[in-house]
């Protein structure tokens, strides 16, 4: 009789006699006076056995013997093809038929159960037959433990024929047992933590909610996918599922760097396996956010092994959902094709498209919902904040890829113009990126330079950037003139008495005149912050220029004292000259400050000719 035991107290299969001695051993012990009357061949090995104990428990052998009698064929020789587990498992099944005890273990229970099903060792022929014994072991031992259920499922992978275990529904039951046990352990761990409170102690293997992750990594991808799907159905935490997916991917795809070398040896088998693994893992992602670094890693691997387009688009969509938290290193995706640019800007462009689509959908949803104004403004502010973060990241990304000589102007401009104007409070970062692109692509003609510089809003450049523009010989003259003109207009506005308080009051008045229209943070909050910052910068510049004018006034007085004989003529000439170069067109009411400021601007332009910087930053 077969023994269901975890202890090796009975005769083990490893200590069984060789097949050539197998039948004679049974004959001397049980049927010492009866010679073997049937020979069964399994995987090329012959077993000389007795019909009586076999037909008493094996329905298949009983049918075979009956058919041989009817056909008057050789009654003493037959072959069992595609026997589950091979000759070793058949030997254990024969031991059971002869009443010899052996050990059923986690490693052999699947093979024995499938062999019993193949031989039709059901209760119809004998009570407590081999199928019933193995089922009892599975239910009472294997399926009650997550770890043992995983081992049983792993043994299903190596069994031949591969689909024989499915006929007994063993993989399905293993999958459900793993999912149920994982959820049970998650619940038990939570309750134990509540009972323990703040008490400290060493964590055992079962105290960690994800201790089983390492065990699942040994599964084949199709079985692993079934386990993860079952865990999601039974309510396992998404964090645990994501952690398991990340660990499985790292273990399964860690040899991807040598993928090209391996594919030459095995005709693409390794690459196909990696592709199937990656696509399956992506399809198992829960709705919760997956860590960005892991998503970018999967995307890089997917590009390398050329995964399906749908898989790449799903990864790009998930990255776009949390693009505001991305780092510059994540965006620098190398190109795998030779002769192209260094970085994959097309992928980044698609990610930006998905991100902007998400922002647009969120804004439309907020408009459709009848929430209070505070809630609407808060949601809009969050969207605008995400846009500003992405704008800063993209400026850094543009500056990083700009020196690449293989990067085309068309792709560079496409990355710039995809973001709206309100995604940047200041254009200093954009100007820096464009300047680096011009420096790395000296062959651009004047028209191409103009089309590139048109994206820079001169009103959103800091004083430092404006000073750099005025001395940058890589820029078209039209760009320099626009910056100088913007500087003059800003100075005129500052000196005419416009202040931040006036802008704020004007904005509030405009809002009060349109009470039915919801104020968009994109149009008010960001613009007010930008204008306040510009006003502070203008005030600082005015103070510096006033100091310079005071110094110039002292120098002028000293010169007039030295040339007292021509003092009146010199003063008259200076007054006329300053009046002619007055930019604002003001009369005497404008004061000496504006006239002297024009002289300072002329001196700045003369300095431009003397020195040209190589780079802004």
UniProtKB/Swiss-Prot annotation:
At what positions is Phosphotyrosine found?
431
Sequence intervals crossing the membrane: none
List the pathway annotation: Protein modification; protein ubiquitination
Q: Which Gene3D superfamilies match?
A: Potassium Channel Kv1.1, Chain A (3.30.710.10)
Give residue ranges for domain BTB: 36-106
- Pfam families to which the protein is assigned, alphabetical: BTB, NPH3
Q: Does the keyword Phosphoprotein apply?
A: yes
Q: Where is the composition biased (Basic and acidic residues)?
A: 602-617
Q: Which GO terms describe its biological process?
A: protein ubiquitination
Question: What keyword terms does UniProt attach to this protein?
Answer: Phosphoprotein, Ubl conjugation pathway
Superkingdom of the source species: Eukaryota
Q: Where is the NPH3 domain?
A: 210-490
Q: What SMART domains is this protein classified in?
A: BTB (SM00225)
> Region Disordered: what ranges?
505-525, 585-617
The answer on whether this UniProt entry bears the keyword Phosphoprotein reads: yes
State the similarity comment. Answer: Belongs to the NPH3 family.
Q: What does this protein do?
A: May act as a substrate-specific adapter of an E3 ubiquitin-protein ligase complex (CUL3-RBX1-BTB) which mediates the ubiquitination and subsequent proteasomal degradation of target proteins.
Q: What does its UniProt record remark on the domains?
A: The BTB/POZ domain mediates the interaction with some component of ubiquitin ligase complexes.
**UniProt protein name:** BTB/POZ domain-containing protein At3g08570
What species is given as this protein's source? Arabidopsis thaliana
